[in-house]
Amino acid sequence: MQQRRPVRRALLSVSDKAGIVEFAQALSARGVELLSTGGTARLLAEKGLPVTEVSDYTGFPEMMDGRVKTLHPKVHGGILGRRGQDDAIMEEHQIQPIDMVVVNLYPFAQTVAREGCSLEDAVENIDIGGPTMVRSAAKNHKDVAIVVKSSDYDAIIKEMDDNEGSLTLATRFDLAIKAFEHTAAYDSMIANYFGSMVPAYHGESKEAAGRFPRTLNLNFIKKQDMRYGENSHQQAAFYIEENVKEASVATATQVQGKALSYNNIADTDAALECVKEFAEPACVIVKHANPCGVAIGNSILDAYDRAYKTDPTSAFGGIIAFNRELDAESAQAIISRQFVEVIIAPSASEEALKITAAKQNVRVLTCGQWGERVPGLDFKRVNGGLLVQDRDLGMVGAEELRVVTQRQPTEQELRDALFCWKVAKFVKSNAIVYAKNNMTIGIGAGQMSRVYSAKIAGIKAADEGLEVKGSSMASDAFFPFRDGIDAAAAAGVTCVIQPGGSIRDDEVIAAADEHGIAMLFTDMRHFRH
């Protein structure tokens, strides 16, 4: 049963006024009486719409600089009144039924994001009347429609037209879900902000306050259900943040191909975040969350050719990310050469998409061009808890490096060292990366001892016939013993970049000097677990 309810009276009170005039005009044209407050009422009146101020309806003025507007029985009685059950008491107290509530809330998130926002500014942007009306209308969704998103305006008008001015229970229930999601997210933002302010509020330093609230409330929106999770016996879904500010796998548009799997998304994220580190045309190939080939080149085709050479075997069934538009030449090279799960780039040319269309199972994503990296949080779920930390956006430049050996690196060694240092940041620890002429030639990932990662990188290079002599090596963390340096020297490495900080640094540096290796300290670690 559809349980339609006609919309005869609507209360509109919005902070974000995008589309509200057109929506109000559409409601009014369909005979809906309009109630409104403050700035919304003034805007509608300026546009010539017949609108009744809530203060005129209640006989009670707005007061306390707008803090009290809608907190009145004639408003909430009209929203909460159960049709057919509360009619008598509503009539006794001259309460008119309100069939639709259109509300969005004070911009708390935007306010606290502004530089220099004070606690007083934040407090004044905590909406009280708005959430109260939203919750009241959502609670009484059996009789009332609650609208919190301007993106729903057109669909609501269409349904009213299809149902003689009424909305179905299914629609009202869906709108109620959105309303409770909206208020939950809003309260979570406030709780997180206040929770992180507690020490500072008691006179402690800003540093003491930190950025982590005492209770962490997170709100993510489900983008899609997965066929399964990391393994076929696990159920899964993909949730994204609202208003993501940086090009990412979460914001990407899928242009073609099968639905993304859980592992596709995880691996695509790893590839995209790595390729973002490079200003020059770059390609990153990822397999099982680890880069298996990375290169920069004169073009993305050149970069892809060089990245592929690192490890063609592992590249099979991998994820390929570019930091430039996918062009026809690169698309053709990929499709002709290998099986690929996902290609992601800021954009793709029409010619490139015609080529990839021949392989309909290949997933092609475009994410838009990115600018500055946006600070944020990383999460790792543990049984019974959640680890939270800042995103690892740290990266050193040449001017921050310390040469700790007798020999200075050559210009090419230095370039390669900085290149493979960027790659090592995205390789699972213990991470070792060999690079030469701006391409990886061997990657050792995820080993329990650093020396074995170094040996594996050398084996990988030898297997592909890539010359290690004169290459640079990056290690994501310090060398606890000299054995990693000995292994690198045996392979032909002539420059090493690493954080330093081991109690045996002197032994490690001495080993480098014995082998004539230049060694650079970054004083920054990039563990990745």
UniProtKB/Swiss-Prot annotation:
Annotated GO MF terms: IMP cyclohydrolase activity; phosphoribosylaminoimidazolecarboxamide formyltransferase activity
CDD domains named in the record: IMPCH
InterPro entries: AICAR_Tfase_dup_dom_sf, Cytidine_deaminase-like, MGS-like_dom, MGS-like_dom_sf, PurH-like
Pfam families: AICARFT_IMPCHas (PF01808), MGS (PF02142)
Catalytic activity, EC: 2.1.2.3, 3.5.4.10
Record domain MGS-like: where: 1-148
Any Gene Ontology biological process: 'de novo' IMP biosynthetic process
The keyword Acetylation appears for this protein: yes
SMART domains given in the database record: AICARFT_IMPCHas (SM00798), MGS (SM00851)
GO cellular component: a single term: cytosol
Domain characteristics, as noted in the entry: The IMP cyclohydrolase activity resides in the N-terminal region.
Record-stated family: Belongs to the PurH family.
Protein name per the record: Bifunctional purine biosynthesis protein PurH
Species annotation: Escherichia coli O9:H4 (strain HS)
